[in-house]
Curated annotation (Swiss-Prot):
Name of the protein: PsaJ-like protein asl3190
Pfam families per record: PSI_PsaJ
GO terms for cellular component: photosystem I; plasma membrane-derived thylakoid membrane
Family affiliation: Belongs to the PsaJ family.
Membrane topology term: Single-pass membrane protein
Organism (species): Nostoc sp. (strain PCC 7120 / SAG 25.82 / UTEX 2576)
UniProt keyword annotations, A-Z: Membrane, Thylakoid, Transmembrane, Transmembrane helix
Major location category of this protein: membrane
Length: 50
């Protein structure tokens, strides 16, 4: 029983260390995509239509 609790703690700590990493990576990809899109197709606020 003690070994299974140790494994559960190990897996839980791996999950806690992986979730923030995945969150930072996914947010970085999303904002990078947004920035590149706005670089290629600028916002109409700075380039208004005539």
């Amino acid at each position: 029983m003690n070994k299974s609790q140790d494994k559960e703690k190990k897996y839980f700590l791996e999950y806690l260390s992986l979730a923030p990493v995945l969150a930072v990576i996914s947010i970085s990809v999303a904002f990078s995509t947004w920035a590149i899109f706005n670089y290629i197709f600028p916002d109409l606020l700075f380039h208004p239509l005539p």
